[in-house]
């Protein structure tokens, strides 16, 4: 195989590999709502299944401010660090910044952690049980 053909084949392989990995990364929108009049405080969907590398987009839809805080009680040290590392602009341990206005978003790229269920909640609306769960698939 001459150099030009080999180079073209290598480039095609890189493009294909990039496309395959881009397809493997799923994006999921999780809306966050609070409505005092209707007594509705929720993440929609409240249960999300994802894999490492997937992108979770939390969007404040109504009733801001909102936040995303992961429960840390039963996390191993490595998992705790991985989740903290995935949460850019953290304002505290396992905690996103406040989404101050409706329409604002917060993104998390799911870190490589053990399969299982990870619970999260909205700190400003925790008393109203605004909570959800992230299920990490095998």
Model-derived features with residue positions:
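Bacterial N-terminal signal peptides that target proteins for export
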Residues: 1-9
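C-terminal segment of classical bacterial N-terminal signal peptides
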Residues: 14-21
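Extracytoplasmic copper-binding redox domains, predominantly the cupredoxin/blue-copper superfamily
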Residues: 22-138
């Amino acid at each position: 195989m001459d150099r030009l053909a080999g180079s073209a084949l290598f480039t095609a392989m890189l493009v294909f590999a990039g496309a395959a990995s881009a397809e493997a990364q799923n994006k999921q929108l999780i809306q966050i709502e609070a409505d005092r009049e209707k007594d509705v405080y929720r993440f929609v969907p409240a249960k999300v299944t994802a894999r490492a590398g997937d992108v979770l987009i939390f969007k404040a839809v109504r009733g801001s401010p909102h936040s995303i805080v992961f429960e840390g009680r039963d996390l191993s040290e490595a998992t705790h660090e991985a989740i903290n590392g995935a949460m850019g602009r953290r304002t505290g341990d396992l905690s996103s910044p406040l989404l101050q206005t409706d329409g604002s978003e917060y993104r998390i790229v799911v870190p490589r952690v053990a399969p299982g269920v990870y619970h999260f909640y909205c700190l400003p609306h925790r008393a109203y049980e605004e909570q959800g769960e992230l299920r990490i698939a095998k």
